Amino acid sequence: MTTFELFPADVHNKRTIQQGHPPGWTNRRGGEYDLVVLGGGPTGLVAAMTAAAGGHHVAITEQRLTGGTCVNFGCTPSKALIRCARAVHDAARGAEFGFRLDTPPQIDFAAVMERVRRMRSMSSAGDAVDAVEQTGAEVYLGHARFTAPNVVEVDGRQLRFRKAVIATGSDPFVPPIEGLRAGEYLTNESVFSLTELPARLVVIGGGPLACELAQAFRRLGSEVDLVSNTQSLMPRDEPEAGELIRRRFEQEGLRLHLGSKAVRVTSGRLAVHGPAGTRELHYDALLLGTGRIPNVGHLDLEAASVRFSNSGVQVDEYLRTSNPNIFAAGDVAFPEKFTHAAMATARLCVTNALNGANRRATELVVPHCTYTDPEVAQVGLTPDRAREEGVAIDEYRLELAKVERAFLDGEEEGFAVIYTRRGTGEIVGATLVAAHAGEMISELILTMTHKVPLEVVAETIHCYPTQAEVFQRIALQYASTRKGTVPIWGIPAAKGGDRINEEPAK
C-alpha cells in the first residue's frame, strides 16, 4: 500500500489526502474486469464512471491522489490563486469606480494559500475514492503496470481485463539547465505548497501556466521576471493576443525576457542569454512552466505490446493502441493537453472500446483558454493554421471596447475574431481576448461542433447589455455582406457614438 503526503500538513491537506488516497486503504484481491483504467485523474475517472454507469465491471488504478493533476496540482488550485490575485488587482483600481481605500490593500499570503488549499479540498471531494466506489467502479491504489497483453498488476494484485484504457496523464517537463537540481525549483506540483510569498520570483516559460502564475504572483506582490525562449507569449495563440498580454504584463510591472534562454542556475541566480547578451536574474523562488511530457514510464507497456515514444502512447484516430484491446486517452496520448479534452477523449474511448462504436478523435472540436487577465480563448483554426491546412478563410472582427457592457465594466481591453470558410457562413475558428473569455467562448464551440452557420448567430437574440453580444455583432457584420440578404432583424444602431460601431469585415 502506497502513502502520499502534502505540505503543509494542515486540516485542508489532510482532508485532500483522506479523500484521494486514504491512509490504511486495502485493495481488493484482483479479479476479472470488463474494463481496467490506469490513472485516476479526470480522464481515468470519466472513463471508469462512464463504463460503470453502463453496467460494466470496472477497475481503476491510481498511484497518487484520485482527481489527478487538475484538481490537486493544476486547474483547481491555480484558479483559486488567480481569483485572489484578481481581487487584489480590482481593489487597487478602486479610483476608476469612485471609491478610494484609506490604505493600500494588505495581502496576507498565508491566508491566500490557506484559501487555495481549502478550495482544493472541497473540490476534490467529488473525486474521492469513496465517491468513485459509489459509482460502481473498484479502486486500486498503488503502482500499476502491465504484465501481459490482458493483465495489469497493482501491488501484487492481478487485474485481468477485456479492455483497458491508459489514462496516466503527464508530468512537468524539467528543461536541461546547468545547475538545476531537484528540490531547488517549483513546478505546478509544488508551487501551491508555498506558505510565504517569494519576494523575487523567476518564471521560466511563456505558455499558459507560466503566464497565469507570473501575473498572479506579481499582483500578490512578488517582483517577477518571466523568461521564455519564444519571441512572444503564448505562441500557440494568435500573435496579436500574445502581444496584448505582453503589453498588459509590462503595465503591471512584470519584467519580460523574451527570445531568451535560461542557461545556468547558481545559488539563487539564473543566467539568461538573450538578444542583448547574458545577464543574471536573482530570485527567491524559481518556477518552471515549461510544458508537460506524457507519463509513460514504469508502465511496462512492452509487456502489453503497446507502442509508445517520448511523445506518448501511440494511438490511431479511434484512440486504439497497437494492442487492439487497449485504448489511451488524455495527456498520455492526445496532443491537446487540457482537462476538457481529456474528459472528451475518455468518453470516446469507452464508447469505442465497450460499445463497438468507431468515433474518431479528429472529429472533436477542442477549445482552450489561458486564464490571464484578460483571458485568451481559442477554438478551431487561426490564420496560420488555416494556411498550413490550405483552408481559405474570411475574417470578421470587433474590438471589445466597442461592446457597451465591456467598457461599462471597465474591461474593454481585448477583441473577438471569427473565421469562416471563404464565401460561406461555416465557422472554422475563433479567438476571443476578454476578461471572461473562457465563459464566453462556449457559444462558438457549440456552433462549430454542430455546424451552425454564422447567420444563425446573427438571428439569435442575445441579452443586452452583455459582453457576449460581441459574437452577435460580428455575425451581423457577416450578414450585412451577403448580397440581397439584409436581415429583417437588422443591425442595431450603435450606442455611445463611434465607440461601439461595428468594424468592416476584412
Show which residues each predicted segment covers:
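Beta1/beta-strand and adjacent pyrophosphate-binding region of the FAD-binding site
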Residues: 26-43, 197-207
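Rossmann-like NAD(P)H-binding beta-loop-alpha module
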Residues: 195-237, 338
